[in-house]
Amino acid sequence: MSKIPPALLSEAIQNVLKDRKERKFKESIDLQVNLKNYDPQKDKRFSGSVRLPHVCRPRMTVCLLCDLVHEDIAKKNDVPTMNQEELKKLNKNKKLVKKMCNQYDAFLCSESIIKTVPRLVGPHMHRVGKFPTVCAQNESLPDKVLELQSTVKFQLKKVLCLGTCVGHVDMTEDQVRQNVVMAINFLVSLLKKNWQNLKSAYIKSTMGKSQRIY
């Protein structure tokens, strides 16, 4: 059960959407959360991902590391690819792997070659949090891309503040609300004492002011 006051959330979302201006890029809406009574040194550091009801990052670029069959499917769906031969050419070269990782926001990988990826590219993808998600050939590739564009991750590191994208300013108030509520409820479920560990929460657009929701 969410403890976010509905009226406060509604007002915050309206303020975020009202403040948007015509820009050359689509502003994202971020959820920013501060925790309390948590010790990152002693308490278990959590990490978890959840798929939100609506696509929050439509501009997220996804590349498929693929076998030859999957390559044809990807081309028909305008999904960028790198096949095994192209991956072999990287030859675990740090600079080249880094360049590939910087070029795309996320990666998918054909089920048939997932086990060879660490051998071909080394540990860098894992290190930067971009190790590919498996995509079986019987799964719809466009759906898998949408899934990545709708999924957010929470990971506690050394500081007690967390943030993630939960939408963009072209969404409706209702779509933003559904995404925010699901994201915050999921985060709370990862916390040791649930809502008791939540100090405050805000939403803000890229260029807008922070709006407190908790």
From Swiss-Prot:
One Gene Ontology molecular-function label: RNA binding
Keywords assigned: Ribonucleoprotein, Ribosomal protein
Superkingdom in the source lineage = Eukaryota
Instruction: List GO BP terms, alphabetically.
Output: translation
What InterPro entries does the record point to? eL8/uL1-like, Ribosomal_uL1, Ribosomal_uL1-like, Ribosomal_uL1/biogenesis, Ribosomal_uL1_3-a/b-sand, Ribosomal_uL1_CS
GO terms for cellular component: cytoplasm; large ribosomal subunit; nucleolus; ribosome
State the family it belongs to: Belongs to the universal ribosomal protein uL1 family.
Protein known as = Large ribosomal subunit protein uL1
What species was this sequence derived from? Trypanosoma brucei rhodesiense
Underlying gene: RPL10A
